């Protein structure tokens, strides 16, 4: 099964393949820009498409306005457990976003490890909807971690054009 969909940007196809078996279920880290105005059903549809029918143990997001709000609503609509991990801007200033992104990824990996068994791998799927510097930080961090992750780690960048392509006519 391929982890690539029409929504995946061309750069994602160049990512190294995971050294782990195909995951049977997932922990999802999802994020995107504060200005993303896609309706929740489009977000939900893309999350379901990227999960490829695998059960979702948990969906983690940054709790910001825009994409994160739509992601949280989509998880609720889909019946997926979800948790927000907001950035601590007061404590960390401009570094809060990258720190939060690292925490999201590490929490997802820990959760996947705790649910994995020798016969059933739980993977982490990072789904990045269109966004700015914060989303780019999440993508960069995730891509750097693919080969060193103790669990399967898959990274998908959703193309900005998907929003208009999926919109109802």
Predicted regions and their residues:
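Acidic/glycine-enriched connector segments
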Residues: 3-29, 34-168
């Amino acid at each position: 099964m391929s982890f690539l969909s029409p929504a995946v940007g061309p750069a994602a196809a160049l990512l190294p393949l995971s050294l782990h078996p195909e995951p049977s279920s997932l922990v999802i880290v999802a994020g995107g820009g504060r200005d993303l105005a896609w309706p929740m059903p489009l977000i939900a549809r893309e999350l379901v498409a990227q999960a490829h029918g695998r059960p979702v143990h948990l969906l983690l997001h940054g709790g910001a306005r825009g994409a994160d709000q739509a992601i949280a609503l989509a998880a609720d609509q889909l019946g997926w457990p979800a948790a927000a991990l907001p950035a601590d801007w007061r404590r960390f200033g401009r570094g809060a976003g990258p720190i939060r992104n690292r925490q999201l990824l590490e929490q997802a990996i820990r959760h996947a490890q705790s649910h994995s068994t020798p016969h059933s791998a739980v993977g982490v799927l990072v789904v990045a909807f269109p966004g700015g510097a914060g989303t780019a930080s999440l993508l960069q961090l995730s891509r750097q971690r693919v080969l060193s992750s103790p669990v399967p780690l898959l990274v998908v960048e959703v193309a900005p054009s998907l929003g208009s392509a999926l919109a109802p006519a």
